[in-house]
């Protein structure tokens, strides 16, 4: 039957939630990332052409699975994951055209090209980085009735690691302390939890410091 429904919509975010939940199922991972499947004497290749070396324009050695789909209205779509050097990314490309690119004589399914470009950018441009190190001082708070000091340092309980752009200038990162008390009553013990902090980059909270 006709799969097109006028009010049938979804988003890349919706697809990511469904896919991430499905990837928790070992059988789903096994079958959705199988490059080809033998069935009754036939070899059935995965419809994601990024998995097949023979398709030079599309092939991406780090790609795995997951799902492709196309209709006249939705054009070309792909959900694919890639793993490299300990990093794992999920690319979801929707409503991508089929067209000639770079003076080619044939039509290119741009969903695969776009997903490949996204992965190449992510692996080259993003890095897992320690933004705040364990025991790093991020502020201070006054202490009432203290014997040796009027203030104590607020330090991070653990390392806080986040994926950020390569070469990030840490001055662009804002550490915003949350619910800081006006003062503490002595005695204050080492390791005592006082408050937390948000790490903000580009007007977005990217992590929290306990």
Q: In which residue ranges do the predicted regions lie?
A:
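Short, small-residue-biased leader/transition segments that mark boundaries at the very start
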Residues: 3-4
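Domain-terminus/edge residues, biased toward the C-terminal soluble/receptor-binding domains
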Residues: 8-210
């Amino acid at each position: 039957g006709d799969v097109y429904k006028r009010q049938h919509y979804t988003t890349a975010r919706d697809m990511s939630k469904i896919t991430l939940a499905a990837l928790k199922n070992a059988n789903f991972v096994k079958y959705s990332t199988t490059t080809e499947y033998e069935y009754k004497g036939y070899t059935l290749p995965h419809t994601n052409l990024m998995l097949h070396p023979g398709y030079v324009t599309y092939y991406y050695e780090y790609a795995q699975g997951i799902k492709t789909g196309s209709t006249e209205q939705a054009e070309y779509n792909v959900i694919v994951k890639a793993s490299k050097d300990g990093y794992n990314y999920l690319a979801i490309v929707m409503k991508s055209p089929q067209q000639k690119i770079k003076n080619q004589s044939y039509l290119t399914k741009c969903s695969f090209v776009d997903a490949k470009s996204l992965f190449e950018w992510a692996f080259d441009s993003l890095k897992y980085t320690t933004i705040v190190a364990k025991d790093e001082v991020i502020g201070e708070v006054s202490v009432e009735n203290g014997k040796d000091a009027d203030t104590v340092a607020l330090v991070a309980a653990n390392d806080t690691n986040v994926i950020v752009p390569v070469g990030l200038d840490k001055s662009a990162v804002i550490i915003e302390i949350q619910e800081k008390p006006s003062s503490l009553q002595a005695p204050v013990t080492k390791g005592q939890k006082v408050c937390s902090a948000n790490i903000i980059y580009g007007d977005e909270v990217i992590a929290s410091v306990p």
